[in-house]
Amino acid sequence: MVKAVAVLRGDSKITGTVTFEQADENSPTTVSWNIKGNDPNAKRGFHVHQFGDNTNGCTSAGPHFNPYGKTHGAPEDSERHVGDLGNFETDAEGNAVGSKQDKLIKLIGAESVLGRTLVVHAGTDDLGRGGNEESKKTGNAGARPACGVIGIAA
């Protein structure tokens, strides 16, 4: 079992953790989140981005992690970036707690997300269905108020 965590910080009140667990290279990865400080009753996009570089804030993380050259999509789509995690939903206080399994997110192997950045976006991810070029790249999910580098966890 490999475990990893991203501790979220940024230029906003959004904080939290996103954890990853994978039993072996052929198993799906469980992604769990506990994120506070978002807008209440909202859907917010979150993605794994290419770089683990946050020297200039979350913008240094680069584009979505996309080793196969696909267009942006929903986590359940066959045509999607590896880093496309979709949206999480917040409660009336702006907090989000949840988990999902993902078949493309890997902690083991050549396409591992270790050392890359998990970014929480300011808007809702349209899952590549927005009808414009930006939708096929970013899901029109907006600014990057919080992020954290994905590191090996104890």
UniProtKB/Swiss-Prot annotation:
Q: Which SUPFAM superfamilies match?
A: Cu,Zn superoxide dismutase-like
Q: Which reaction does it catalyse?
A: 2 superoxide + 2 H(+) = H2O2 + O2
Keywords noted in UniProt: Antioxidant, Copper, Cytoplasm, Disulfide bond, Metal-binding, Oxidoreductase, Zinc
* Domain of life of the native organism: Eukaryota
Q: How is the cofactor bound?
A: Binds 1 copper ion per subunit.
> Zinc: is it a keyword of this entry?
yes
Know the name of this protein? Superoxide dismutase [Cu-Zn]
- Which source organism? Aspergillus fumigatus (strain ATCC MYA-4609 / CBS 101355 / FGSC A1100 / Af293) (Neosartorya fumigata)
Organism lineage: Eukaryota, Fungi, Dikarya, Ascomycota, Pezizomycotina
| Name of the encoding gene | sodC
